[in-house]
Amino acid sequence: MGADLVVVTGASGYIGSHVVSNLLSKGKNVRATVRDVNDPERVEHLRNLKIEETGSLEIVEMDLFDSKSVDSAMTGATDVIHTAAAVIVRSKNPQAKIVDPSVIGTKNVISAIEKSGTVERFVHTSSTAAIRPEKWENGVTLTAKTFASDATLEENPYGLAKYSAEMIVRDWHDNLEDSEKIKMITIHPCMVFGPPLSSRHLSGSLSVIMMLMRRELPLILPMQINIVD
């Protein structure tokens, strides 16, 4: 595949791990960023992934709040898939624990992309929380142009985090000069179910399955889920 290098942020997470696995199965060169390269729960399952002959895997430590480590991780990349973010929806300190990782982290990632001068494609992993307002009329169709602009730190910190990060990447991309334009895609997953690659993946969306098995939730959930196979 030549000199192409795909950087996957948040590679130890549930979505990030599956992205890395998929890329390696296609023979891609992958640089996977994790918070702690010495934590077996974060890296062991990545090291055990099958790598096709033309591919390679490099695991590096990166802190979203440390711009220098983000800059280093992006060096030489041709593609960036940004999946790193806080996945909790409630906290005693929602600004620091939920909003800041998405907002500051995303700002550092796009700054590093600009500095690299090599990135051609960027995928930003957002969420339906970014396009789902707190209130909407019955029958309305939520789209990538329907934003959670009414999300607040007190009532919906996760939605605020995802909405804010979405606005950051869109504004950044819109303001790039034509000569600097890179291809950008934002995706908006809802709840994500599938095989866990690490014990750490049993939280988040997969915790719903565990709660159903333990009969802690009704079989018919009081929520809306967009089903995509």
Language-model features, listed with the residues they occupy:
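N-terminal Rossmann NAD(P)H-binding glycine-rich loop of SDR-like oxidoreductase domains
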Residues: G2-V30
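Structural signature of the Rossmann-like NAD(P)-dependent dehydrogenase/reductase core
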Residues: V8-T9, H82, V123-S126, I185-M191
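NAD(P)H-binding glycine-rich loop region in Rossmannoid oxidoreductase-like domains
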Residues: D36-I104
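Conserved cofactor-binding/catalytic machinery of classical short-chain dehydrogenase/reductase
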Residues: D66, G105-N108, S164-A165, D229
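Conserved Rossmann-fold NAD(P)-dependent oxidoreductase catalytic core, especially the SDR/UDP-sugar
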Residues: A86, K92-Y158, E177, I185
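Active-site helix of classical SDR
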Residues: A161
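NAD(P)-dependent short-chain dehydrogenase/reductase
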Residues: L176-V228
